Structures are given as structure tokens and as C-alpha cells.
Regions:
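A residue-level marker of the well-folded mature domains of exported/periplasmic proteins
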Residues: 4-15, 22, 26, 30-303
Length: 303
């Protein structure tokens, strides 16, 4: 009868529905168990692509599936990415913030969903984070100063171009450089901000050269300012003044290899990504992790 056929179809449908429900649960659990989520500020910058590649390699090694979402340097997109991941039942979140303040909302959203958060490269000023992984900027500043001492000698006359006041990078790199200043008894002629900017680096350096023509070495807290300072020195015919940058950007490393920049302190973004996944693995296994993991840097000089 028609009723029998309907009953049979309903039974089939019920079986089908429960099968679908079961597979949905299984896939949610599979995602939750073996997946680490990584939200990157932008994949339009080689630095962060390296960070992602390092994370991917470590995830493959440890047997995790890595889900990567790109925030396209937009805090609203970043928040949407994190919301998407909380709905998907992510067990742990690695986030490289678009902005230290703006990321607070995304971190708090993950906190409310009881998802542990690990920040990479940039810190979050709000919300709870289990661990922060970034380059050891203090050590980098000291390495730069030590190299200047090696080449220009103890007691060298130096100028420091500082980054944007208030940023952790400028504060920490400056602190490390000050350690070298004390150790090598440098005569610091001037320390002035040029806001991590190439044009400002050029202008500030031109002004400082007028006041301090006897400078022997310049430490710029990033490669952009270093390249600006280099231009000012070239224009003034002072090619004997050594300039040391920081970051190891493609332009910075090229200037080192061309013999223009004395050195740059390169960050290792792939290691930041790898350390992030390694730390996530520990958190998922219930092991204790440090609140902060400093990642090594390397001195790049002409080969």
C-alpha cells in the first residue's frame, strides 16, 4: 500500500538523516582533534608567507592539519575569520594580529569559546593569551651594537635612528643596543626617531650629519631607515660611515650583498611559525608552556 511505501521511505530517510548527523559529528571531531588554526595578518607580505610555510612544515611533521585564514590586513576580516573558526569547533588558535589593539576583540571571542590563543610576531594588548612567540628584539639590538664595535672599534662615535616611539620593536631593539653601548663605551652623538620610514631616515640623517660630521657608525632600528640614512651619507660623500639595519628585508639584504649596508639583523619568520605550532601541540597535550618564547635572529653580512 501507499502507507507501507511511505513508512519505508521515512525509515530510509531517518537512517539517512542519522548517518549524515553521525558523519557531521565525526568530521567536526576530526577537525577538532587534529587541526590547528592559523590566522595571518596578510599573505601579501613575504615575511608572513614564510611564517605560514614554517607553521605548515611543523604541522606536517607533528601530524596536524593546518587551517590557514588570511585577514588581508583588515581587523574586521580578522574578527570574521576567528568567528568562523569558533563555529567550526577549532581546538586552538594561532593568530598573527593585524594590529595589537584591534585584535583584542578576536582574542576575547576565542576566550569566550574556551579556545586557547597563541599570538605570533605581534602581541595582543587585550584578551587572554597562553603564549606569545616573536623575534628576540633585545638580543638583535645587542648583536647590531656588537658588530659595530667589531668593525668601528670600542668607543666609536655612533648615531641611532629609532623606530616609532611606543612600539615594542623600537623599545626592545633600543634596549639591546644600549647594552652594547655600555659594553663598548660608544660615544652616542644622537638617538632620534625616524619612525621606521625610509624618507624620514634620509631627512633625519641629513640633519644629524650637519651637527655631527664626525660620526663613524649608524644603527637604524629597521632596514627602511637604514636605507634612507645610506642615501643621505652617499649624497654627503661619506661612504666610510658604516650603517647597520634590522629586519633582513629583501631590500636590506640586497644592500648588504651590494656592499652598501654593513649588516642587517634578519628575523626568521619561518621559525616563528614553527615554534607556534610546536607550542600549540604542547597546549593540546596539556603540557605547560612559557608565556613568551623568543625566536633567534641572524646577523647578515656580505658573503
Amino acid at each position: 500500500t501507499l502507507q507501507d511505501i511511505l513508512d519505508m521511505n521515512m525509515k530510509k530517510l531517518a537512517t539517512l538523516v542519522s548517518a549524515v548527523a553521525l558523519s557531521a559529528t565525526v568530521s567536526a571531531n576530526a577537525m577538532a582533534k587534529d587541526t590547528i588554526a592559523l590566522v595571518v595578518s596578510t599573505l601579501n607580505n613575504p615575511f608572513f608567507v614564510s611564517l605560514k610555510d614554517g607553521a605548515q612544515k611543523e604541522a606536517d611533521k607533528l601530524g596536524y592539519n593546518l587551517v590557514v585564514l588570511d585577514s588581508q590586513n583588515n581587523p574586521a576580516k580578522e574578527l570574521a575569520n576567528v568567528q568562523d573558526l569558533t563555529v567550526r569547533g577549532t581546538k586552538i588558535l594561532l593568530i598573527n594580529p593585524t594590529d595589537s589593539d584591534a585584535v583584542g576583540n578576536a582574542v576575547k571571542m576565542a576566550n569566550q569559546a574556551n579556545i586557547p590563543v597563541i599570538t605570533l610576531d605581534r602581541q595582543a594588548t587585550k584578551g587572554e593569551v597562553v603564549s606569545h612567540i616573536a623575534s628576540d628584539n633585545v638580543l638583535g639590538g645587542k648583536i647590531a651594537g656588537d658588530y659595530i664595535a667589531k668593525k668601528a672599534g670600542e668607543g666609536a662615535k655612533v648615531i641611532e635612528l629609532q623606530g616609532i616611539a611606543g612600539t615594542s620593536a623600537a623599545r626592545e631593539r633600543g634596549e639591546g643596543f644600549q647594552q652594547a653601548v655600555a659594553a663598548h663605551k660608544f660615544n652616542v652623538l644622537a638617538s632620534q626617531p625616524a619612525d621606521f620610514d625610509r624618507t624620514k631616515g634620509l631627512n633625519v640623517m641629513q640633519n644629524l650629519l650637519t651637527a655631527h660630521p664626525d660620526v663613524q657608525a649608524v644603527f637604524a632600528q629597521n632596514d627602511e631607515m637604514a636605507l634612507g640614512a645610506l642615501r643621505a651619507l652617499q649624497t654627503a660623500g661619506k661612504s666610510d660611515v658604516m650603517v647597520v639595519g634590522f629586519d633582513g628585508t629583501p631590500d636590506g639584504e640586497k644592500a648588504v650583498n651590494d656592499g652598501k649596508l654593513a649588516a642587517t639583523i634578519a628575523q626568521l619568520p619561518d621559525q616563528i611559525g614553527a615554534k607556534g605550532v610546536e607550542t600549540a601541540d604542547k597546549v593540546l597535550k596539556g603540557e605547560k608552556v612559557q608565556a613568551k618564547y623568543p625566536v633567534d635572529l641572524k646577523l647578515v653580512v656580505k658573503q
